[in-house]
Structures are given as structure tokens and as C-alpha cells.
Amino acid sequence: MGDLFWTGQEIYIENIYRPVILGTLIFFVVLAGALAFGLFRHYQLLRLGTKENRFDQIFTRLKITLTEVFAHMRIIKEPYPGIMHLLIFWGSALFIIGKLIRPFSYAVELSNPPQAVFLYASLLSEIGAVMIIIGGLLAIYRRYIAKPSRLDTKPDDTLIYGWVFIILLTGFMAKGYRIAAGGIQPTDWATWAPVSYLFSKMLPTFDTQSYNEVLVWHRAVLHTIPAFMFLLYIMVNRSRLQHILLTPLNIFFRSLGPKGALVPVDLEKAESFGVSKIEGFTWKQLMDLDACTRCGRCQDNCPAYLSGKTLSPKKVIQDLKQHWYDSGPDIFGMFRNKLKGKGIDTGVSMIGGVITQEIIWDCTTCGACQEACPAYIEHINKIIDMRRNLVLDQAEMPETAEMALRCIEERGHTCKGTTACRTDWCGDIEGAKLLANDSNVEILYFVGCSAALEDRNMKVSKAFGKILRAANVNFGILGEEESCCGDPARRIGNEYLFQLQATKNIETFKKYNVKRIVVTCPHGYNCLKNEYPQFGGEFEVLHHSQYIAELISQGRLKLKNNLDKAITYHDGCYLGRHNSVYDEPRTIINALPGVQFKEMARHGNKSFCCGAGGGHMWMEEKTGVRISEMRTEQALETNCNVVATACPFCLQMFEDAIKAKEASEKIRPLDIAELVALAIADEVKK
């Protein structure tokens, strides 16, 4: 069977494949030129951005990229589109490998054993083509019949589907004709080219004298030329299929720093603050725009969009991308100016025109968009950069946000109108001592503005203080020396104020030789842990959920009281998505006696924002549904009587939303510290 097959291959190579290879080589030259043109255009557009170092940790980047590209770790999280994309991706890989084996093995005169090489190459191509067709049909059904709202269909999408099917169909037809008219026993082809064999049964045979001419016409005109034109189209026309190259590149250059940390600004060297024009973004931020495939996963997970706000993270990226492309007609002239030292200036402001202020302020910086994006696009830094420009260069921001910033500047906290001082909460807590009196402590409890000064959250700090006392922890506080961590200032866009606060707190920590800090606020936790190191503040920072879990595991806390509660847990964005602290709060809840724990539908890294992040604790939601009320509805669906939190902002948002929905009799928000305090108290309040 193998000899008969190989005889057919020799005839094919001598009479048909030589001219096809020659034509292919000519097309390859054209394609190489088109590829060079496309890459040069992308390179020039990327150079429009400012410098940024993303070339560190090369091997780590390579490992992450290969894992994401070949295993589809993020894409497969949604089963239907994940399986669809896997079929198309691996089908294309098998198809291309099978197609390349023949010409390359012929070029190196592979002959040991050539029969097996060609047979397996044929089978690989057939399997790959079938996988592409199945994946393509799934994609067509999803896009044109199911029509999920996050997808927008453009002519390019429809053209791609049709073009790919034509290429595959003509390939089957060409091989099918070879089988029908080539005089080769059908048993060989039924095994090694099953789909083409089926086509051979539907195709007419021709006079032997016309066989070669017909086959060349099929191969070159109906199959090879459309295939090369398809590749040419992708490279020149900015097709979405360019993500085949651009997405792996974007993944390779993804940020390897802490997810919750924003990029600092060098205030001394900055001539202006933030970004108002496209050329103000870094080259990597611009690469993000190119890598977007309009899949809409970010939009499907954005609490602002889902609650009816103007913001759509997908549209932000696409609008910036189009603006970036539109800024390119005189791009070569701009680079000539750059070479002459004149710099680049498109002269067009993004803020107000391309991206409205309303969109910029809608973002809660929850990170749901970035967590969902298979291309690892970084949305938050772009929005924060535009906020920085609005706040520091244009002095424009929501009035309530401005009041919060002014309060930090004048009082060192965000709690306007409070009459409390930072030590009122610990009046009846034995063992709490000021570092100014004794700095020889096991931990510093950095209380935070809300837990120190707001009535509802003072209950949390009191509960945590009782836990520390019960565990015989030698802890200290800063008292009036404590100042706002700076997170609200940074997320609202006042980088200058944030750096003042960070520097001030770092100096205080170092003055008392602080080594270990525990924080009850995830925003402060993220700030101290991930952002203070940018300014020389290297400390061990723990969230109180981590520390309580540690105390329980060490046997220093005895949870003895039966709580008799049904509890669901809300993953705060800055504890969960931004810092991957998911297990410790659940470990604590499951350790509580008499507790039935039930997850919300959206939990873990898919948790839904409470609506307070990104400075929204101090902003009004003027459009759509309140995000906090949407999250409260999700908590109510669990039929639990307690929604546990580990964040003062989340706790306050639940308090307000539950009252607004008149659900106080159904569910009660409690911090995990309050639950633990109940479990160790002499008398449990149900």
C-alpha cells in the first residue's frame, strides 16, 4: 500500500508540485514584503508612545506566554467560546504543520521513509481542517444566531469566515480530484485522507491527458491563490486575525508587578501630569489597543457597564485604538520631527472628545475587566492616567471627590465632619498601646480612616482589637500619628497627594522600626503592600483575614460559640482580584461553629464589585442602577442571613444598599472580624 501511495506522490511532485512550489515561493516573497510592511507600520505606531521597560524577566515572560497561548488558560474559563477557540487554534496548527511537512521534506530529499511522512502529513492536515470547520461553525452559530450582546459584528468578521471555508473546501476538492482521477487505490486515501476521499466520490473523473492541467488549476487558482490572498489581507488590512501575532506579544509584555499597584509618576521630572493625548501613553499601553479582539469579556464583567453606566471597557479600548490609528496619517512626518528633537504632538486631546469625563469617572478600578481579558490588556492604568490629567493639570473632578481630597490634605483622613479621634475605638480594649510609648510590639495595627473614625466601621476595629487581646498578641497603634494611606488620592488621580501621604507614613513606620503591619482595609493593605515599596517602604503587610487565619491555625484563638448563621462571603476587589486573597476569609468562616456557608454566583476572581472602589466611596452614582444594590441582590439570592465582608468600604455599601432595598430583616452585613469576635465572646448576639 505504501509503495503504491509513494508512486502517486512521485508523479504528483514531478508533474504538479514543482510548478506549484515555484509559484508558492514567488508568493512567499510578496507575503514577506507585506509582513514587513505590516510590522513596520505597527512598530512606527508603537513608537508614538513613551518609553517603558517591559524587557525584564525574559524567561518568566516566555513561560507565561507559552502557557497562555497553547493552553488557553483564560479563554477556556468560558466553556463554549473556549472550546470553539481551542478547536480553531489547534486545528490551524495541525493543518499548517501537515501542509509544511511535504515541501520541506521534499526540499531536503527526505526518503527514510518518505511514505510515512507524507501519509501522516495528509492525515494531520485533514484532522486540522475538520477541527477548524467545527470551531468555525460554533463561532458562526454564536455570532449570527445566539448573538451575545457583547459581540459586535463587522464586515471583516463575515469575510474571514467565508474565506477560511473556501480555502478548506478547495483543498478538499483538489485532493479529492487527485484521488478520483489519479488511479490510486481508494483504501489508502480512505485511511489517510478521509474527508478528501469522500469528496472524491462526488467529483467527476477526467481524461488522463487533462488530469495534470485540471489539478494545477484546482491547486493554484482555487486553493493556493485564495490562501495567499487571505494571508495578504490579514497583514495589510489590520484584520482582527492579526491577534494571532499581537496577542502573544501583548501577553509576553504583560506587567509582572503586583496586580494592585499603579505605575508611579516621577513628579520632579514631569512637565505635565497624566495623559491627555494618545502620545502620552507608553508603547505598551498602545500595544494593548492593538491586541484587543473585541471579544467583549471585559464588558461582560464590568460592574459599571452592567449597572447601566456610560463606561464600557471594550469601547474605551476600541475608541482609543481608532483614535490612535487616526493619528497616523502624518505619522512619518511626526517621526522625522522626533529625530530632529522636536518631539511628537498629535495636537488632539482624547479627554472630552474620544473618551468623555463621565466614562473616566465611572470606573471603580475593580479589575474585573483585566481579570477576564485573554490578551492581558491593562485598562485601569489608562483610565487612572486620564484622571491624573484631569485632577492635576485641569483641576476637574467630581465635587464630592474633591472634598475627600481636601479632607486628606487638611486632616489626614477622608472622614469629613467626624468629631472622633483615631484612638476613640480602642478605649475599652486592653493591651492596645501607642508606638510612641512602646514600639516593642509583635505587630503594628494600621487601623485606617474608616475603622478609626466612622461609627459603623469602628465596630470592626473594636472586634479585631478583642481578637488580638484574646490571642494575647502584643500589638501597637500609631494613634494620631497615623494618616490616610493615600489610596483614595491615588485612585481619584491626585498622585501628588498620594506620594505625600505615602512618604509621611513610611517615615513614621521607619521611625518606630516597624517590621510587620496588619490592616483591616484591603485598600490600605494593597497600598502598603504593593505601592509603598515604590517609595522605599518595604514591610511585611498582612490583611486582618490573613492574620486571623494565622492565629487560628497556630491555636492562639479558640472559636467556641455556636453562631447558628447562614453566611455568604463577598470577595472585595482589592483583597481578591488585586491581591489573590481568597482562601483565608473562607477558612475563617468555615472554622466558625454553627455556620452554614454558601457562595454567591459571582465569587472568587469573578466577584462583583460593591461599587466603592476607585474613589467611588466619595462619588455619587448618577446614572443606572447602584452597583451596591446589584451586589446586594446577588447576596439575597443565597437566602443567607449574613453577608460577610473583609473591607470597610464593602461593609458600608452593603449597609446602605440593604436599607435602600428594605432587606434589613433578611440579611445583615458583618465583617469577618465581627463574626470571629462573636465566636470567642462570652455571649453570642444572634
Can you annotate each of these PLM segments?
Residues 1-12, 105-120, 177-216:
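Membrane-interfacial helical/loop segments at transmembrane boundaries in membrane proteins
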Residues 259-313, 365:
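Non-transmembrane accessory domains of multi-pass membrane transporters/channels
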